[in-house]
Amino acid sequence: MGFTEETVRFRLDDTDKQEISKTLTSVYRSLEEKGYNPINQIIGYVLSGDPAYIPRYNDARNQIRKHERDEIIEELVRYYLKGNGIDL
């Protein structure tokens, strides 16, 4: 499969964004409760796709796997940009 020169559009609907936000918050808390560095663990999962970065504790692993990693990245970028004054 080759790459195209045309720009491809990617969009999430608002319901997906809210679900991803809830999931990330829940997973963060579960990681924190288990004594992990939540940021490092979530980054490890998002970059590698390896669910072993997220514990089964509080069903965190199953929760985060319900979302595609690219959708998680989109929500993280959107949240960061909004927090830095960018109107989206």
UniProtKB/Swiss-Prot annotation:
Top-level taxon of the source organism: Bacteria
InterPro entries the record matches: IreB
Pfam family, one: IreB
NCBIfam families for the chain: PRK05473.1
Family: Belongs to the UPF0297 family.
Protein name: UPF0297 protein SSU05_0066
